[in-house]
Amino acid sequence: MIQEKAIIIGGGPCGLSAAIHLKQIGIDALVIEKGNVVNSIYNYPTHQTFFSSSEKLEIGDVAFITENRKPVRIQALSYYREVVKRKNIRVNAFEMVRKVTKTQNNTFVIETSKETYTTPYCIIATGYYDHPNYMGVPGEDLPKVFHYFKEGHPYFDKDVVVIGGKNSSVDAALELVKSGARVTVLYRGNEYSPSIKPWILPEFEALVRNGTIRMEFGACVEKITENEVVFRSGEKELITIKNDFVFAMTGYHPDHQFLEKIGVEIDKETGRPFFNEETMETNVEGVFIAGVIAAGNNANEIFIENGRFHGGHIAAEIAKRENH
């Protein structure tokens, strides 16, 4: 069993930021990541532009300089790799945490796909991007249905449905149209979401107006088959459209089960873990959370730009305990 002073589960920007803050108080935390560093950003659409400006994505006082105000995915990947190198953050990549158990003497045993560790402090920064919100409709498990969008090229000359009406849906629809797909967007809301990036909405609306994109508001998907999608538009009758592929961009949620198994209490309504906002410590002493996982089901509440500060609260609390 390997002893560590602190273990961070999750190597996204907020987990890496926590590692840097812990280094500043003399704790060289180990980051355990099931993919590689900033795995969620790697899984973003290939041509993704960030909502935040580059300086709001900075961690560890390492400057993130880009020619445009808002960086793109590949620039962010390069930046966070550089931070890991420059700050000598220890990252065990491609290692999956299987189980976290609290022992009688207030330490934790962390079992992974490769090793077993023991530590007094466990920081969970696992994000939410691995767990899509399923619609629960027949056919959602067909191989032609995706909950992540990478790029448009494979869908050239195909009939594609995008489900959802927020940024990820609009981004996917625009990329698909550029690649020559025939796109229908089904959104259960009655108007465009106010959260859509203001610089892409005009382009999207223009494509809807000229008929390039078919936009259906008040649309509820009833079922998906090999060659069709059936939906209900408002109170009207069922509508069936020809379909080759579906992108269900219906959002994501944190892994509640993982937290609950450790003993962290979750608010059933909001999906938010119980934690002290000043220290980021949960109801389980020694277990802290960092990043979007603290927001529960409302992923629009915490981003990299505010989640990156959680590590400072955690480090301050741990420093207090270590100095007693």
Swiss-Prot record:
C-terminal Cys can react with bacillithiol (BSH) to form mixed disulfides. S-bacillithiolation protects Cys residues against overoxidation by acting as a redox switch in response to oxidative stress. InterPro entries: Bdr, FAD/NAD-bd_sf, Ferredoxin-NADP_redctase_2. Its cofactor is FAD. It is an enzyme of class 1 (oxidoreductase). The keyword S-adenosyl-L-methionine does not apply. Keywords: Flavoprotein, Oxidoreductase, Redox-active center. The keyword Flavoprotein applies. Pfam families: Pyr_redox_3 (PF13738). One of its GO terms (molecular function) is flavin adenine dinucleotide binding. The modification S-bacillithiol cysteine disulfide is found at residue 220. Its EC number is 1.8.1.-. Interacts with BrxC. PANTHER family: THIOREDOXIN REDUCTASE 1-RELATED-RELATED. S-bacillithiolation is the formation of mixed disulfide bonds between protein thiols and the general thiol reductant bacillithiol (BSH) under oxidative stress. BSH is an equivalent of glutathione (GSH) in Firmicutes. This protein is a NADPH-dependent bacilliredoxin reductase, which debacillithiolates (removes BSH) the S-bacillithiolated BrxB (BrxB-SSB), and to a lesser extent BrxC (BrxC-SSB). Involved in a redox cascade increasing the efficacy of BrxB function by reducing BrxB-SSB and thus reactivating it. This is Bacilliredoxin reductase Bdr. It comes from Bacillus subtilis (strain 168). The gene is bdr.
